[in-house]
Design a protein with these regions (language model features):
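Short helix-coil transition sites and intra-membrane helix breaks within transmembrane domains
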Residues: 32-42, 80-91, 123-127, 266-275, ...
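Helix-loop-helix hairpins and the membrane-proximal interhelical loops
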Residues: 1-60, 191-299, 384-385, 401-407, ...
C-alpha cells in the first residue's frame, strides 16, 4: 500500500505543467534523434545530461527518461519510410515496415509501430514498477555461460529465417559472422584480419554497417531502377485513426504479449540490448505465425513483434540500473551519469533514501509512453509526406544524412567509408537474391557470442563446465532442437518437391 501511495504522489508530481513541458520536449528531441540514422538515443541523452544539472533530481531524471523513450521509438519512422533503421533497435522493423510502405500502407505500418511501441513500453514499465527487485535477483544468476546460451539460441534463429533456401541463408549468415571477426579480439585484444590497417583495429561499428546494408544498398537499387525506367511511384493510402481496426488490434494481442515479455526479459540482462530482443521477437513471431510466408513482404505481425519487444527493453534495462546500479545498455549507462550528477547512488539504497525519485521515474516512464504515442500520432501525416518527395531529390538527401549519421557515431571518416562498402555488400545480396536478415542477425550476435564464450571459459576453465548450469542447458538444447527441426523441414520440403517433379 505504501508503494501505491508513493506512485500516486509521483503521478501528481509528474503531471505538473513544468514537468510535462520538459517531458514533451524530451520525447520530441528523442524522436528526432531516433529517426535520423546515426543519431542514437544515447547521443540525445548525452546532449540533455548537462542541461538537467540545474533541475531537481526528480525532474532531471524524468527528462532523461523522456529522451530515452522518444529515441528508441523514433527509429521506426525512418525504418518504415526509408528502409533506414534510425537506431539499432529498429533493425527488424525494416523487414516488413518498408515493404508495407512500398505497398501503399505506410500510414498503417506507422500506426501499428506507434501503438505497439507505446504498449510495449507501458508493459515493461508496469513490470519495472511492481517486479523490479525480484527480477533483478534473477538477473544476478546469469553468468557469461547463460548469456552465451541466449546468444547461441539467437544465432540458431538463422535456420528459421533461412527457411525456404537454407544454403543461401546460411551463406549470408556466415558472411555476417566473418565481418565480426575483423578487429581486436574480445578480452585479449589480439588483432585479427586487420592487414596492418589501423582503422580496422576497432572493427566495424553496428550503426554504420546497418546504414550501409539497408539505406545505401536501397539507394543503389533505386538508382538502378531509375536508370532503367522501372521505378514505381509509391502510393500512400489514406486511413482513419491508426490505420487498423479493433478486430486487427485484438488479433495482434498474443503476438504483442509474447514479444513484450521477450523484450523485457532481454532488457534485464546487461549488454544484450534492444536490437537482439527485436530480432528474437521477430523470428519467434515468424515461427509461430500461420502467415510465415508473408514475413519480409509486408506482414503487420513483424512490425508488432519488433516494436513491442524493442520498446519493452527500456523498462527491462532500467531494472538492473535502479536495483543494482548496473546499466542494462548504452543509454542507461548515460543515465547512471545522471544519477551521479544529481548526487544519487543507483542501487538497493536508492529505494530507501530516494524513494520519491524512484517512483517519479516509474510514473514518468508511463506518462512519457503516452506522450510519445500522442506526439507521433499527431505527426503521422507529416511523416508520410517523405514518400511523395521526388526520388532525384530524396536520394541525395538520404545519402547526405547517412554519411553525417555514420560520421557522428564515432567521429571518424572510416565509418563513412564503411557504409559505402556495406552498401555494395547489400546491393550484391539483392542482385544474387541473398537474404539480408541472417547477415544482420549474425553480425549483431557474433561479437557478443564470442565475448561471453571467452569470459565463460576464463571463469569456468572449460566449455564443458557450462553444462553444469541449468539455464544454459535449457537455451542450448532448445537451440539444437531448432537447428535439427529446421534442417528436417528443409530436407522434407526438398523430398516433396523432388517427388512432385
Amino acid at each position: 500500500m505504501q508503494a501505491l501511495g508513493l506512485l500516486g504522489n509521483a503521478f501528481v508530481s509528474v503531471c505538473q505543467p513544468a514537468s510535462l513541458l520538459l517531458m514533451i520536449a524530451g520525447v520530441a528531441v528523442g524522436i528526432i534523434f531516433g529517426s535520423i540514422p546515426g543519431l542514437s538515443a544515447s547521443m540525445a541523452v548525452a546532449l540533455f545530461l548537462p542541461l538537467t544539472f540545474s533541475m531537481t533530481p526528480s525532474m532531471g531524471m524524468n527528462t532523461l527518461v523522456a529522451v530515452y523513450i522518444g529515441g528508441i521509438s523514433g527509429g521506426l519512422i525512418s525504418a518504415i519510410l526509408l528502409n533506414m533503421p534510425g537506431t539499432a533497435s529498429s533493425i527488424a522493423t525494416t523487414f516488413d515496415g518498408h515493404p508495407m510502405a512500398k505497398n501503399g500502407e505506410a500510414m498503417k505500418a506507422l500506426g501499428l509501430g506507434i501503438v505497439f511501441s507505446a504498449m510495449g513500453s507501458i508493459f515493461s514499465f508496469i513490470v519495472l514498477t511492481f517486479c523490479a527487485p525480484s527480477l533483478a535477483d534473477i538477473a544476478l544468476k546469469f553468468t557469461p555461460a547463460e548469456n552465451f546460451g541466449i546468444c547461441f539460441f539467437a544465432l540458431t534463429m538463422v535456420a528459421i529465417l533461412a527457411s525456404g533456401n537454407m544454403i543461401k541463408g546460411l551463406l549470408a549468415g556466415m558472411l555476417g559472422l566473418m565481418f565480426t571477426l575483423i578487429g581486436m579480439a574480445p578480452i585479449d585484444g589480439t588483432p585479427r584480419f586487420t592487414f596492418g590497417a589501423s582503422n580496422l583495429m576497432a572493427g566495424f561499428d553496428t550503426l554504420p554497417t546497418l546504414i550501409g546494408i539497408f539505406a545505401i544498398s536501397d539507394i543503389l537499387c533505386t538508382a538502378e531502377s531509375m536508370g532503367s525506367g522501372k521505378l514505381e511511384t509509391i502510393e500512400v493510402k489514406k486511413v482513419k485513426g491508426f490505420g487498423f481496426s479493433m478486430k486487427e488490434f485484438v488479433y495482434h494481442l498474443p503476438n504483442f504479449l509474447r514479444s513484450a515479455i521477450i523484450g523485457t526479459g532481454i532488457g534485464i540482462l546487461p549488454g544484450i540490448g534492444g536490437s537482439t530482443s527485436g530480432m528474437l521477437a521477430y523470428v519467434t513471431a515468424k515461427n509461430m505465425s500461420k502467415k510465415r510466408d508473408e514475413f519480409g513482404k509486408g506482414c503487420p505481425d513483424g512490425i508488432v513483434a519488433t516494436e513491442s519487444a524493442n520498446n519493452a527493453t527500456i523498462g527491462g534495462a532500467m531494472i538492473p540500473l535502479l536495483v543494482l546500479g548496473i546499466p542494462g545498455d548504452g543509454v542507461t549507462a548515460m543515465m547512471l551519469g545522471g544519477f551521479l550528477i544529481h548526487g544519487l547512488s543507483a542501487g538497493p539504497l536508492l529505494f530507501v533514501k530516494n524513494a520519491d525519485v524512484v517512483y517519479g521515474i516509474f510514473a514518468a516512464c508511463m506518462v512519457c509512453a503516452l506522450i510519445m504515442l500522442v506526439v507521433e500520432w499527431t505527426c503521422i501525416k507529416g511523416f508520410v509526406q517523405v514518400l511523395k518527395v521526388p526520388k532525384h531529390i530524396l536520394l541525395p538527401l538520404i545519402l547526405v544524412l547517412c554519411c553525417v549519421g555514420a560520421y557522428a557515431t564515432n567521429n571518424r571518416i572510416f565509418d563513412v567509408q564503411s557504409i559505402l562498402v556495406f552498401g555494395i555488400v547489400g546491393y550484391l545480396y539483392h542482385k544474387f537474391s541473398l537474404p539480408t536478415t541472417p547477415f544482420v542477425l549474425c553480425f549483431l550476435i557474433g561479437e557478443m557470442l564470442e565475448t561471453y564464450l571467452r569470459r565463460g571459459i576464463m571463469q569456468y576453465k572449460s566449455f564443458g563446465a557450462f553444462f553444469a548450469r541449468p539455464i544454459f542447458d535449457v537455451f542450448f538444447f532448445i537451440a539444437i532442437g531448432v537447428l535439427v527441426w529446421s534442417v528436417y523441414k528443409e530436407y522434407k520440403a526438398y523430398l516433396d518437391k523432388k517427388k512432385a517433379a
